[in-house]
């Protein structure tokens, strides 16, 4: 395709970082864009170009980390629009990295559309300044939850902000979940409870590692005895495995646990989640997958985005993941299991509403694209002359 005359959409997020949540977002976004605008040339800006090319061989991939302004400008100036998002990329010390590239695009006259962004924690004045300076000039600003809208407003952004929902809510499952579990020697003749952990870090700076490891070990042992269950830890990124093993090492019933070690695509992980009987976890997109699969779930909110999601789907959620909440947490697990038919029915209704809002993000972007970069005209074929 001659990109000088084509419509070109760039997509910038935490892609190529081998986080299944971010990859689920990208996959769902690309699926909708390809379905509606097959004429569009897509360029994904990736942290690991080789990984992204293997996952999405039908799009162009550009590495951007550690690339100077002059070189990245060669790719940006060819775009019709740059999509920032989705995913939680606007937080302290990280936001400025993405927004420098956004400002470069804007300086080149490339419009920017923010797509169901997640924001927070965002208190560093340098990052807040970047937010105000760049997003004020965006064509449109959409965020995935009310928490993110509040964070951007507190950072000083005064323009209209539209709340939609996480793009990963539109992910479709793949196949082979049973085979993937069998390959990891997960038994299939018992109840399966999925658990999700994560590492402390800038996005979870108040997380007490030792405390939450022991808390989840207590929960795991309770599940084994209360439900006669096998506990499966589902890593959403590579470092989750280390924390999962730390939890298992503190359990009395470690032999009733499996930590998955495979490499999975988002669609495969969603299909694995569909095989669970119960889901308890910290990672937002693990919880989104459970909601999509109709699995009763208990969020463990380490950050506002998880608590916000729990509220939106009507799931119970304790404030914080600390050892002192062990008794309350075990009681909530017990209640969730006993009330699971009603809980799932309620959650399914709420999830359908969120999927409509996620569809709304795509609709808004595609409408913007149609206004600024119209679809190519398709000329009707001339009628075939009648045989004489």
Label each region the model flagged.
Residues 1-388:
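Active-site anion-handling motifs in enzyme catalytic cores
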């Amino acid at each position: 395709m001659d990109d000088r005359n084509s419509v070109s959409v760039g997509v910038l997020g935490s892609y190529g970082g081998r986080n299944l949540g971010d990859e689920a977002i990208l996959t769902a976004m690309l699926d909708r864009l390809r379905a509606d605008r097959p004429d569009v040339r897509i360029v994904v800006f990736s942290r690991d170009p080789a990984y992204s090319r293997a996952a999405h061989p039908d799009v162009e991939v550009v590495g951007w980390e550690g690339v100077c302004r002059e070189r990245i400008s060669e790719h940006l100036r060819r775009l019709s629009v740059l999509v920032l998002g989705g995913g939680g990329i606007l937080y302290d010390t990280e936001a400025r990295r993405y927004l420098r590239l956004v400002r470069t695009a804007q300086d080149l006259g490339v419009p920017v559309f923010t797509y169901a962004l997640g924001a927070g924690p965002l208190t560093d004045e340098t990052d807040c300044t970047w937010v105000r300076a760049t997003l004020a000039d965006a064509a449109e600003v959409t965020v995935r939850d009310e928490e993110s809208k509040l964070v951007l407003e507190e950072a000083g952004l005064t323009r209209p902000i539209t709340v939609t929902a996480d793009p990963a809510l539109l992910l479709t499952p793949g196949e082979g979940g049973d085979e993937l579990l069998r390959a990891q020697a997960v038994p299939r003749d018992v109840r399966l409870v999925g658990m999700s952990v994560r590492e402390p870090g800038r996005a979870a700076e108040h997380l007490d590692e030792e405390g939450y490891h022991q808390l989840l070990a207590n929960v795991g042992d309770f599940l084994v005895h209360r439900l006669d269950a096998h506990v499966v830890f589902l890593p959403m990124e590579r470092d989750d495995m280390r924390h999962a093993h730390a939890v298992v090492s503190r359990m009395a019933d470690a032999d009733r646990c499996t930590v998955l070690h495979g490499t999975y695509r988002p669609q495969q992980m969603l299909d694995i989640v569909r095989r669970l009987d119960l889901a308890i976890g910290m990672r937002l997109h693990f919880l989104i997958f459970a909601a999509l699969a109709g699995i009763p779930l208990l969020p463990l909110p380490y950050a506002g985005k998880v608590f916000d999601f729990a509220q939106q789907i009507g799931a119970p959620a304790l404030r914080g993941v600390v050892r002192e909440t062990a008794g309350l947490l075990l009681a909530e697990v017990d209640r969730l299991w006993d009330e699971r038919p009603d809980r799932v029915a309620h959650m399914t209704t709420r999830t359908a509403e969120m999927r409509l809002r996620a569809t709304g993000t795509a609709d808004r972007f595609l409408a913007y694209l149609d206004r600024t970069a119209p679809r190519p005209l398709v000329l009707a074929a001339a009628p075939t002359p009648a045989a004489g």
